[in-house]
């Protein structure tokens, strides 16, 4: 392998940074409830699906192993942000500062919700990357659009099935949880479909610029093999 091949791709680094920013931003936006018509959703819906689109692009161009590294880096940065926010929230505010309640609403995530969010993110993201990788091998690199959509459906479904029962079970009425989960999956998948033409162009550009189009033949899919690149 040449020295150039050992160098880290600048575009991969930029995608990694954007991925982490999306995850951290989604955490903050999740604290606001929004309405789309008559449907109540969390503000994280605005940006969180972008992380799945980035995951698709990375897995398609650089392969599952780079996507695995990206997911763990995103998880670590997100955890670091949440931990620092919780630490600052636990420190008493200055006597003259009147925004304690607002700060706590954003950074005082209940441990149950934070844990559910982290577990759901890891499971959903790895399923998304795994499905994307395996379908590319089965389709011999064809049908990117179908692979991107189906991997998102599987990933987002797993994310919702884990997050909502763990975080909101006993808080939201049992009959409402399935509706909430379904709408999250439908809208997040719809988000991906709407931006799919742009995603296709980005993937095409990345493959040409990077000279990469990785097929994951014979790799280890163990999610803990972080540095097995």
Question: Predicted segments — roles?
Answer:
Residues 1-75, 79:
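Hydrophobic transmembrane alpha-helices
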Residues 5-8, 102-107, 137-142, 170-174:
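Helix-boundary and loop/linker segments of multi-pass membrane transporters
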Residues 78-96, 117, 121, 125:
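Transmembrane alpha-helix/helix-exit interface in multi-pass inner-membrane proteins
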Residues 88-112:
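Membrane-interface interhelical connector segments
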Residues 138-157:
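Internal alpha-helical transmembrane segments of multi-pass membrane proteins
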Residues 152, 161-169:
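A structural feature that tracks compact, well-ordered secondary-structure segments
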Residues 153, 157, 185-197:
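Hydrophobic transmembrane alpha-helical segments of multi-pass transport and channel proteins
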Residues 203-229:
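Short, highly charged, low-complexity non-transmembrane loops/tails of multi-pass membrane proteins
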């Amino acid at each position: 392998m040449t020295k150039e091949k050992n160098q880290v791709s600048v575009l991969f680094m930029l995608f990694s940074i954007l991925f982490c920013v999306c995850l951290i931003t989604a955490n903050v936006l999740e604290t606001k409830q929004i309405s789309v018509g008559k449907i109540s959703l969390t503000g994280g819906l605005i940006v969180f699906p972008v992380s799945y689109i980035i995951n698709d692009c990375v897995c398609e161009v650089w392969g599952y192993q780079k996507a695995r590294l990206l997911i763990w880096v995103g998880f670590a940065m997100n955890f670091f942000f949440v931990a620092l926010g919780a630490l600052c929230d636990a420190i008493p505010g200055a006597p003259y500062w009147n925004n304690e309640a607002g700060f706590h609403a954003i950074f005082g995530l209940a441990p149950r919700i934070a844990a559910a969010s982290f577990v759901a993110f890891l499971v959903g993201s790895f399923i998304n990357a795994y499905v994307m990788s395996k379908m590319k091998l089965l389709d011999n690199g064809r049908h990117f659009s179908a692979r991107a959509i189906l991997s998102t459906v599987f990933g987002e479904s797993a994310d919702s099935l884990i997050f909502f029962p763990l975080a909101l079970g006993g808080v939201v009425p049992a009959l409402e949880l399935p509706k909430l989960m379904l709408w999250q999956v439908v809208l997040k998948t719809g988000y991906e479909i709407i931006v799919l033409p742009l995603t296709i162009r980005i993937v095409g550009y990345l493959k040409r610029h990077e000279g990469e189009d990785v097929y994951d033949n014979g790799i280890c899919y163990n999610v803990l093999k972080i540095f097995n690149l």
